[in-house]
Amino acid sequence: KKITLLTALFGTFISASFAQNKFGYINSRELLEVMPEVKKADSSLQIYAKSFQDQLESMSKEYESKVKDFQANEKTMNEAVKEVKVKEVQQLQERMETLQQSAQEKTSKKREEMYKPILEKADKAIKDVAKENKYDYIFDASGGAILFAKDSDNVLSLVKTKLGIK
């Protein structure tokens, strides 16, 4: 009996404490999609990544040319020349692989650098909206953590207003 009574009292206490809290949610992906800073960052990142892509395409053409040249003239080459040509092709292939890996790492790092202030700005706006509107909790619906929420508690429009986005 004591356990049942304690469970009932505990359940009532939990229900009462949740009833006093104000919950809200936002889809952070949707917020980021409408922030002009994200569009600028994405555009800059595309240009940055394109410079690496152009280098890789140039190296790829050079690689194809060397392979075709080797295949066309292989029968007339002595062993020493063959070794040199094979080594050139292998070294070019290694440089291409290194450049591709480096490009991915540098682009990823650049993206993190460019997005950091944007994410901080969005986070600050969400926290400001939560405090100004007396929310106890704001959940991110883009993470799939909420299955149901009233539209009236979606704070996306308030955060967009806070950021000056229409």
State what each model feature region is.
Residues K1-F23:
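Bacterial Sec-dependent N-terminal signal peptides
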Residues Q20-K166:
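Amphipathic, charged alpha-helical segments and their helix-to-coil junctions
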